[in-house]
Amino acid sequence: MEFTVGSRTIEIKFDYMLMFKVNKDLSTRDDNGGSNEDGVGALFLRIVERNDSALVDLIKLCASKKAKAVSDEEALSAIALKLEELDATNTEPIFKAIEEEMVDSGFFNEKVLKYIDKLELALKYLKAKSETAEDQATAQFQIEQTEAQIGRMKNALS
């Protein structure tokens, strides 16, 4: 998928280089500041959940580092222009296309599967922890949210 930012065309190509950039720039950090290498999975979840900031992050990451950095406003304008090109009234066609491209990319698919494995481990931890949690409602909510996220991601992969 391509977006136009000013006079530049920014191509979003789900290859090894983008996978590396996403993991480098969007991964969470452990207590020591090291990367958890979960950026691809987190980005995929944001795409599946139709989080608009994920589109902005993708455009900014795909812009050449040699050229002027892309601002949030420029990325949002590029999304608006793409919506006009697609004659779309909402962002669903963009999200759907990006989701499909991520699923079709071997690099991204592998990382997403690892992310789901980590979420499933976290779910086991949440369930065990909920047995002794003081706030049962919050614990149950966290479990339900994590189960829903796993379900949405697995559905998108199938």
Model-derived regions, located:
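Alpha-helix-centered segments that form part of catalytic cores
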Residues: 56
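Charged interaction scaffolds used for protein-protein
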Residues: 1-6, 29-46, 53, 65-158
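Short, extreme N-terminal segment that most often corresponds to the first beta-strand
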Residues: 1-25
